[in-house]
Amino acid sequence: MADTQKLVLFSGSSARFGYDSAALDAALPHYEVVNMGVFAYTNALPQLELIRAQMRPGDLLLLSPEFDAAKRQFFTTNAFDDAFFCMAEADYDIVARLDLQQYSGVFSALGSYLQTRADMTARSYAVSPSDLDEDGNAVDTPSYNEYGDYVLYRPDAVDDTPIYGLPVDYTTASFPYDTYIAPANAEFDRFAADGVRVYLTYSPRNSRAVSADSTPEAVAALDAYFRENLDVVFLTPLQDSLMPGRYFYGTDNHLSTNGVTMRTAQVIDALTKQLQVEGIAP
């Protein structure tokens, strides 16, 4: 798809659990939709560099960084980790497409990955991720569609109670400029220099799975801080990403099936309006 005009969705697993890409595809007929959300707790930098090599002028990149893994999602380090090699198992040659001189810890991460892999029971490469659910259990219908969305039905939660005791901080103090904003802008600017339009919509999170300091005023201030400093076009307010916990399944940032429908409709509305403002056909 390198030569096809496309919309690439990028985040961690909240993206593969967070979009109805078929609905996006229908709303944006000029673009092929690709969901590249995999795992937030590995460095996003090498992932995005591999993605950037496949994008062309006029393509759209829609980011939705996960704040519970902010250091990795905002490129605060160039270090490799073993999880990156897990994602490369289908084609180890993709590692050679990166300029490894730009990264640290490559061989230590590889060693850690190989050690872990050696202790695991071998599985057939004929088995696709779509043959298994998120917990590794075999399923009768594909768990992923052709876009990369996780599509097994996920019911709403019975109430809004957070799943994990991990209250994420949505305050400006948690995102100092030099640590988070500067490296993020450096990567975003590489895409822009290639003619790729870069947009941001915040990743969804259970509104009760935030810190006590993350008051509505603090959330609004953080949104304003990002808008003032990040070199991207913002589609939606930060507050809109904090949703009732009933619309999540299994974690505080994986949406239920109903949550996906709601969130995708919000993104479609915001993105199509922004493209119209820019004079671009959806």
Stretch-by-stretch model annotation:
Residues F188-S214:
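Active-site segments of SGNH/GDSL-like serine hydrolases
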Residues F10, S14-R97:
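Membrane-embedded segments
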Residues F80-D194:
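Secreted/periplasmic serine-hydrolase-like ester/acetyl group-modifying domain
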Residues M1-K6, P282:
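N-terminal secretory targeting modules
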Residues D213-P282:
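C-terminal regions of proteins
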Residues L9-F10, N35-V38, Y170-Y177, E187, ...:
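Second-shell loop/turn segments in exported
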Residues T4-K6, P29-E32, R56-L60, A192-Y199, ...:
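Loop/turn elements at helix/coil->beta-strand transitions in domains of secreted/extracellular proteins
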Residues N35-G37, Y202, T236-L238:
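Residue-level recognition of beta-strand->loop/alpha-helix junctions
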